Amino acid sequence: AKGTAGGAKLRAFVSDVDTPGYKRPENPNHFALVIGIEKYSGLPQADYAERDASAVHRHLLAMGYPERNVILLTGKDAGRAGIEKYVESWLPRNVAVDSKVLIYFSGHGAPSAESGQAYLVPWDGDPQFLETTGYPLKRLYEKLGQLKVRDIVVAMDACFSGAGGRSVIAQGTRPLVSKADVDVSG
């Protein structure tokens, strides 16, 4: 696979860690939402985010997550409506008390200049209008906290500071730092 970063041509190589060499028995109580957004509708791309999400997807299947219980959202499918649908409707309808839930996000993150809240930037997100186009981290944690499940893991490969390659903050600006204060202990 080939891509560009900062105008330079890059070659992506698939490593042996990208392909699981194991297979565990299927567990019907394992659920995952895997989101990888590399090419945005109006933003710089987040290099390798979709490839990373696909690797996580393959590993989850090998770890016993049933394919019907693992949602992989990439590209246009990873818009705000898609993220909302799976976090706020699909998970609550499908998980049970003994379920394990994993949320993986690889893409852009950004803090709102107005509220200081951190947002996941969906495929159709606009960093200048995060309150209406982004997906707030606080909301994600609140929705996950409402699930009556045993275990929840959230893993993110996104920069919210403006200092890294997965942030949409203009270089040289000072972002506001937010703290999610949500009790998810049940």
Predicted features along the sequence, with ranges:
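Functional beta-strand-loop-alpha-helix junction segments that form "active/interaction loops"
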Residues: G3-T19, A53, H57-S99, E131-T132, ...
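Short glycine-/polar-rich loops that comprise or flank the Walker A/P-loop
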Residues: N29-H30, P66-N69, V149-D151, S185-G186
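Second-shell loop/turn segments in exported
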Residues: G21-Y22, K39-D47, I71-D77, D124-E131
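Short, surface-exposed alpha-helical segments at coil->helix boundaries
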Residues: A46, E50-S54
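Disordered regulatory segments flanking catalytic cores
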Residues: A1-D47, A62, Q146-V149, R166-Q171
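Terminal peptide-recognition signature
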Residues: G36, V56, I103
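Caspase-like (clan CD) cysteine peptidase catalytic core
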Residues: N29, R80-S106, A110-I169
